[in-house]
Amino acid sequence: MRTEDIFALGLGLTPPWQVLSQRLDTEKTPHELHLVLGADRGATYPCPTCGRNCKAHDFEEFTWRHLNFFQHHCYLTARVPRVTCPKHGTRRIVVPWARPGSNFTLLFEQVVMILAREMPVATVASFVGTTDKRLWRVINHYVAEAMKRVDLSRLKAFGLDETACKRGQRYVTIFIDLDREDRPVIFATEGKGKQTVQLFREHIISKGCHPNRVLEVVSDMSGSFIAAVEEHFPQADLTVDWFHVVQLFTTAVDEVRKAESKERALPKGTRWGVLKGRETAKTQTQAEALQELESEAFATGIAYRVKEQLRWIRR
């Protein structure tokens, strides 16, 4: 079997496409494998709209980055023709290994999307040997295609929270469908506060959900979030997220500890002991500190008990 035939099998090429030649460039680092694809003279190609085989003309050369061949970067080059279909006119054909307008093969893009779920895009770009700007174009394309298929007509409850995405007070607000166990994230936008809720409202309307269908919203205690939910989702009951309630009370316990430590000596291990839940693993020093705090008249011990009594709410 010829080397070109082996490469054709590996690429999954079907007629009229075949591997015409191959060349390994060892002068570049990393080395580059170049495969030239084409067809026999006079071959016909399918119309990209109806699939009817038509005569080819007006060839133009394109190159695509493919998955590595062993440790070598691999590139596919082909002269891609136009066809004139009696029904749909003259159009450039769509090659089976890449989507229109992309400089990467479909298999390369598939790997990029898998990696982008697990690591920063800049890291993916360094790993595959290209720029993050080029990869962002790939990611944005597939995200946009996926968003076209999103149906939120049955949305009844959602949760939202902001998280810092970069240094310098830059935030992203994320919205999740509380009834979804698999892939619950349904919207994310830069920024935080009231404007993000308005953008989310516009998004779900475009995806088939009327805001009055939403009956429950889970949020933190941000005043801007609460005001926005009351304005844009008037039928929804607002629930404060358990994590933020505990966070508020934990901060209050720490404030009591700081104030009391200025008036009297506290047991060693108090600082980190009171920041942990009763069921959370502690060092022996922390456990002994909590026991002493609760057995004697320490204000910090009283505050800690109040915080721990919140657990019945969750049950």
What are these model-derived regions, one by one?
Residues 1, 23-27, 90-92, 100-315:
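Catalytic center-proximal scaffold of phosphoryl-transfer enzymes
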Residues 1-90:
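Short, conserved DNA-binding cores of transcription-related domains
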Residues 57-65, 95-103, 244:
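Short cysteine/histidine-rich zinc-coordinating motifs and their immediately flanking basic loops
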